Amino acid sequence: MTRYCRGLSQRQAFLLLTVLALLFILLFVVKDPRAKDSRCQFIWKNDASAQENQQKAEPQVPIMTLSPRVHNKETTSVSSKDLKKQEREAVQGEQAEGKEKRKLETIRPAPENPQSKAEPAAKTPVSEHLDKLPRAPGALSTRKTPMATGAVPAKKKVVQATKSPASSPHPTTRRRQRLKASEFKSEPRWDFEEEYSLDMSSLQTNCSASVKIKASKSPWLQNIFLPNITLFLDSGRFTQSEWNRLEHFAPPFGFMELNQSLVQKVVTRFPPVRQQQLLLASLPTGYSKCITCAVVGNGGILNDSRVGREIDSHDYVFRLSGAVIKGYEQDVGTRTSFYGFTAFSLTQSILILGRRGFQHVPLGKDVRYLHFLEGTRDYEWLEAMFLNQTLAKTHLSWFRHRPQEAFRNALDLDRYLLLHPDFLRYMKNRFLRSKTLDTAHWRIYRPTTGALLLLTALHLCDKVSAYGFITEGHQRFSDHYYDTSWKRLIFYINHDFRLERMVWKRLHDEGIIWLYQRPQSDKAKN
């Protein structure tokens, strides 16, 4: 009995130990999964880190992220409409990034989007390295009222800019995108619109009755007339920074959409103009004189005017385009000091008026040529002129002659002057800003060649007389003084004749120029 009880106690002890061992094993099994999960988690983190490092080492591809507006608060699914919208925003964002690389940071117009119209205009500061050349201070812009009443300085106007929300492409994939006129529904106005190249070494006139002196005292002109603005473009004034700046303006007021290689090739052939004020520089040292100039337009008002001798009595005579002289000497004179033209106006004049005697430009060792560069065809004209080739493969292919033939192969580059785009834009902005620029037809507008020539004379001469320009009662006269039969003056949309007529009248009324006007009872022969 005693043995049985002792054996039972041993078995109980063994069972107790077994139970304790099982409990210990159970406790270990319960704890072990946590330790295993933690290790798996560590391994996963290492794998994720390795993948992340691998992604960083590989070339980055632009990733389109969804705007917060696309996500719904309760779900992350996106409709196809939203995806298409986001794709458009991504493309616009990439374009905006490309434009930001320009050295000149600008104000861009807002895209056609109802939401963007409600946003305020974003103004971007101008780059500090616009150009080494001095700039004209102040800024002018358009007004709701016509500028023909005097181009009074107004508050600066800039176009609206809105950047689309999208991720930026990799720096190595960015490309500088060129501006295109088709991107704008009206003329773009940049925050550096009114900055012009100035000639700080410009000669000063000693004539107390000079246009420049009168302009400085005129309430209308004193804030808009720049007597020392750069007039001419040459090899010394063509730089990369100038190209970057002027590429924001459409020709003839800049280089937008032009071929930089072509422009550089021809412009750098022209020697630097030593003195912008050519006529003042021609005066003997210490000589005081008021330089008088006659600017002769081609208007029918000159037919039977008998002012030819009066025109020739001026120190310098400016003519333009189809300047027919033979047979009209009594009406328009015979002398020519400056001849203004565009490649198109010159080729057209030779083609149409060749039988009337205008077969080449006015010739003479003292004649200077003023070329107003309208666009690509003008630079193609210059290239063909330097190569002494025809214009067969250009925008003027219909003109069968070599450009040098128009100058009778006696061209002297010292007397061939290119008008600076800054100067042309200045004349447009401050004197002849048409309402057309605020419409979809903005790209084709420019002042007439005669208007550009007259305003050029205002910046070269002391006293200016204008003949053959549009005036009140122009309906009485034919389009041109050399017309053999009466032709009505047609107001094409690419010019603003009414604006020019009002500006010439105001300049005349303020004594800035003298404008030839026929009495109301007079009529031309034709």
UniProtKB/Swiss-Prot annotation:
Expression sites by tissue: Submaxillary gland, mammary gland, spleen and colon.
Family: Belongs to the glycosyltransferase 29 family.
Region (Disordered): 49-182
Membrane topology term: Single-pass type II membrane protein
Composition-biased stretches (Basic and acidic residues): 81-106
Alphabetical GO biological process terms: ganglioside biosynthetic process; host-mediated perturbation of symbiont process; host-mediated regulation of intestinal microbiota composition; oligosaccharide biosynthetic process; protein glycosylation
Residue ranges that the UniProt entry lists as topological domain Lumenal: 34-526
Organism: Mus musculus (Mouse)
Function recorded in the entry: Protein sialyltransferase specifically expressed in goblet cells that plays a key role in intestinal host-commensal homeostasis. Conjugates sialic acid with an alpha-2-6 linkage to N-acetylgalactosamine (GalNAc) glycan chains linked to serine or threonine in glycoproteins. Catalyzes the formation of the sialyl-Tn (S-Tn) antigen, an antigen found in intestinal goblet cells. Protein sialylation in globlet cells is essential for mucus integrity and is required to protect the intestinal mucus against excessive bacterial proteolytic degradation.
Enzyme category, top tier: transferase
Post-translational modification: Glycosylated; autosialylated.
Sugar-bearing residue positions: N206, N228, N259, N303, N388
EC number(s) given by UniProt: 2.4.3.3
Superkingdom as given in the UniProt entry: Eukaryota
Catalytic activity: a beta-D-galactosyl-(1->3)-N-acetyl-alpha-D-galactosaminyl derivative + CMP-N-acetyl-beta-neuraminate = a beta-D-galactosyl-(1->3)-[N-acetyl-alpha-neuraminyl-(2->6)]-N-acetyl-alpha-D-galactosaminyl derivative + CMP + H(+); a 3-O-[N-acetyl-alpha-D-galactosaminyl]-L-seryl-[protein] + CMP-N-acetyl-beta-neuraminate = a 3-O-[N-acetyl-alpha-neuraminosyl-(2->6)-N-acetyl-alpha-D-galactosaminyl]-L-seryl-[protein] + CMP + H(+); a 3-O-[N-acetyl-alpha-D-galactosaminyl]-L-threonyl-[protein] + CMP-N-acetyl-beta-neuraminate = a 3-O-[N-acetyl-alpha-neuraminosyl-(2->6)-N-acetyl-alpha-D-galactosaminyl]-L-threonyl-[protein] + CMP + H(+); a 3-O-[beta-D-galactosyl-(1->3)-N-acetyl-alpha-D-galactosaminyl]-L-seryl-[protein] + CMP-N-acetyl-beta-neuraminate = a 3-O-{beta-D-galactosyl-(1->3)-[N-acetyl-alpha-neuraminosyl-(2->6)]-N-acetyl-alpha-D-galactosaminyl}-L-seryl-[protein] + CMP + H(+)
Pathway in which this enzyme or protein is active: Protein modification; protein glycosylation
Protein name, per record: Alpha-N-acetylgalactosaminide alpha-2,6-sialyltransferase 1
Keyword Disulfide bond: yes
Gene (UniProt): St6galnac1
This protein's record includes keyword Transmembrane helix: yes
GO cellular component: Golgi membrane
A GO MF label: alpha-N-acetylgalactosaminide alpha-2,6-sialyltransferase activity
Record localization: Golgi apparatus membrane
Disulfide bonds: C207-C290, C293-C461
Residue ranges of the TM segments: 13-33
Cytoplasmic side: 1-12
UniProtKB keywords: Disulfide bond, Glycoprotein, Glycosyltransferase, Golgi apparatus, Membrane, Signal-anchor, Transferase, Transmembrane, Transmembrane helix
